[in-house]
Amino acid sequence: MGQWGFVPPDSGGDSPAVQPTSTRNSAMKALSTIGAATLLCACASSPMMKVDNAALPEPVRVPAGQKVMMSTSGVGEITYECREKKDMAGQHEWAFIGPVATLYGADRKAVGKYYAGPTWEAADGSRISGKQVAVAPANPGNIPLQLVKADTAIGAGAMAGVSYIQRLNTKGGVAPTTPCDATSKGKRQQVAYEADYVFYGM
């Protein structure tokens, strides 16, 4: 093969055209850039979700100057475990363990995943975690709206530059209503939920 990145094709064959290694490397870098851009477009619901922050509860509004980078719909489940209440011997409650969800673009194609941390991971491998800033009540039977301040992203890609994440339009996900007592201590139960996640940056 020498300096060539590919084996020369037969006339009329389906093999890729011969390219010098330097040319191939440049092409691969370009494809990598295009791939990240494509993922960003996929994550950014098309058309991108419009958010009127002034209409949201004040605790979950993003700071002035933040702009929507992308938005996704999360569909998954939240796990709860029946545990004894802290400092309340003999009393039990459903304790939050963590979420697992798939993130979808507007075309309903998966573009990433969400899991305990909280952490959002794009299909390109870039990911962000963060710390909860505030919550605000949602409609009865739904988990609250939430504002998270993101830590620095890990990996170049769709999540790079994200500074805040909002959880909006929540459906379900609240703790089970089934009994939680000494006989069910340690039992885990998954509850389905949906939410829109809106990612902001400067």
Protein language model regions, located:
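Short, Lys/Arg-enriched N-terminal segments with co-localized hydrophobic residues
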Residues: Q3-A27
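Exposed boundary/loop context
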Residues: Q3-F6, G35, P118
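Polar low-complexity intrinsically disordered regions enriched in Ser/Thr and small residues
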Residues: G5-P8, S15-P16, T38, I128, ...
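Contiguous N-terminal and early-domain "leader" segments and peripheral loops that mark the onset or edge
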Residues: P9, G13, P47-N53
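Sec-dependent signal peptide recognition
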Residues: K29-A36
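C-terminal motif of bacterial Sec signal peptides marking the signal peptidase cleavage site
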Residues: C41-A42
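Primary mode marks residue(s) on the alpha4-beta5-alpha5 output face of response regulator receiver
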Residues: M49-T79, K86-M202
